[in-house]
Amino acid sequence: MVDQVKKSQTDLKKTNRSYKKKLTTPPTVLKTGKMDKILVISDLHIPYHHPDSFRFLNKLKDRYDWDKVINIGDEMDWHSINVSHVINPDLPSAADELEVGKFWIKKLEKMYPDMILLESNHGSMVLRRAMAKGMSKFFLKDYNEILDVSSRWQWKEFHWETNTLGRIYFAHQVSKNIVKSVQLMSASVCQGHYHTQSNI
């Protein structure tokens, strides 16, 4: 199964030439009070991630000395157990999606062994599926055990940072309107979820 996913990603790379540009644009670096550099990763949707995403993340690792890595959600897609969309029976099963997902998550953990990850609509799908069926979260394994990662990866509902200009609120989603998000939190907001939107 892992080999099939690798092959499909290789094939996608060959057909999608528009994404073959060299990584020349440096990312935006958030400076905190201690001048920390924070890498924000959002919406990978493993195993359906973009074929260049891991190459890109590896280049960022080699190019910058990140003080902190915050994954603002949807690290996994969990299409096979989705509670709010029709499940495509021709896509990988839950077991297959987990097997392939763990393969890629291990690569990500090797690149970034310390990470804060935020609860999200896809990343939290196992819990959402259990709750939809009336099962308590206390019957479930934690994310670290499900994905076979160390306790250096920490899942949280949201995360706050403070820099010289004020506070930054990190969450998977607050509001599609970023101005409303900022007003609601009375702080700068960094969120994911809205794939086609990029606002400052």
Question: Positions of the model-derived regions?
Answer:
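Structural motif
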Residues: 36-38, 68-70, 168-169, 188-190
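Active-site-proximal beta-strand elements of phosphoester/diester hydrolases
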Residues: 37-46, 166-174
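Short acidic low-complexity segments
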Residues: 147-164, 177
